[in-house]
Regions:
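Acidic (Asp/Glu) and glycine-rich low-complexity loops/linkers
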Residues: 2-57, 61-133, 137-153, 159-172, ...
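Extended ligand-binding clefts on enzyme/binding-domain cores
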Residues: 231, 251
Length: 315
């Protein structure tokens, strides 16, 4: 193929791409000034009692607002005109589900306004709270209390301060997870690339799984703590696992400060491990090519630390 022909093809492709972008932007801003009006708000008053909550949405943020008093619970939904949600109470469960009436033209353009669902509910003990969203954030304050809380968002963040009795489970793909002030029997947090922050929490079992995001724990008490990460770092401060602490990483570093556990097991591939325990430990530390420096004690709980190329330093 001649050089001129190649250049002409490249120019044509660039022009087609540029024209497509300009067309999309033109369609988007052609109705500039009316975009905000397309966000419609509706308020639904709930007259039936419910003990469980089930929310299944797409791009909406979900926010819980507890209140004291005799007012009826209600839901306020701000959404685009061609997207709607059904709100009803069935068999003691408040169910909010997305109904998508959009056509392909509605997906063209840029929507700056974020849609959201705000649930105003009485302060009481609920049996179950389940929320699923795709790109929306989920926010539950500390005044919300439920035996079971299950939260899932793909790219949205999860911010939970609620009191969970038996189970609190938070799962995201790229969104961050922030949990504080919870006291469930079982706590499960899982993310792919999002960061995890767990603070001021007391639980029986805590299981954390992350891929590339960072994992931070501060002021946490439990009996069993397992933490698994790939390339993300793990940082523990003022964490007490009364029976067992286990941390696995690939390339992520592990730092443990002012923390303690009955038995400790830490394994990394290339990640460094360092820190300080509040009580004496019987260290069994080994690294193939990394530097190892740990206290030479033979008392206290067993602390097994292994790494391939990472350094191991404990004071």
């Amino acid at each position: 193929m001649k050089k001129r022909t190649i250049i002409a093809l490249i120019v044509a492709i660039v022009l087609i791409f540029t024209g497509t972008v300009l067309l999309i932007l033109g369609l988007s801003f052609a109705d500039d000034g009316t975009r905000e009006s397309l966000l419609v708000a509706q308020e639904i008053t709930l007259t039936e009692t419910f003990d469980s909550i089930l929310i299944d949405t797409d791009v909406c943020d979900v926010v819980f607002v507890p209140f004291n008093g005799t007012a009826d619970p209600h839901v306020i939904i701000r959404e685009h005109e061609n997207t709607s949600h059904s709100v009803q109470v069935e068999d003691g469960t408040l169910k909010i589900r997305r109904i998508d009436n959009r056509t392909w033209q509605d997906f063209i353009g840029i929507n700056w306004e974020r849609m959201d669902i705000t649930v105003y509910l009485p302060q009481k003990q609920y049996e179950s709270v389940r929320v699923t969203t795709d790109t929306g954030d989920i926010k539950i304050p500390e005044a919300v209390s439920s035996e079971e809380i299950l939260l899932h968002s793909n790219t949205g963040g999860i911010f939970c301060d609620a009191l969970a009795g038996n189970l609190l489970s938070c799962m995201t793909d790229t969104g961050d997870i922030h949990v504080s002030g919870c006291a469930p029997v079982m706590l499960n947090l899982e993310s792919d690339t999002g960061d995890m922050k767990l603070r001021n929490t007391e639980s029986t079992e805590i299981h954390l799984k992350n891929d590339t995001g960072e994992t931070e724990l501060e002021n946490v008490i439990c009996k069993l703590l397992t933490c698994e990460s790939n390339t993300g770092d793990v940082f523990l401060e003022w964490v007490t696992a009364e029976e067992y602490l286990q941390v696995f990483t690939d390339t992520g570093d592990v730092e443990i400060q002012e923390s303690d556990a009955g038995t400790v097991n830490i394994e990394t591939d290339t990640g460094d491990v360092e820190g300080h325990f509040l009580t004496s430990k019987w260290f069994q530390a080994h690294s193939n090519t990394g530097n190892v420096r740990v206290p030479n004690t033979r008392e206290g709980g067993e602390c097994r630390v292994e790494s391939d190329t990472g350094d191991i330093h404990f004071e």
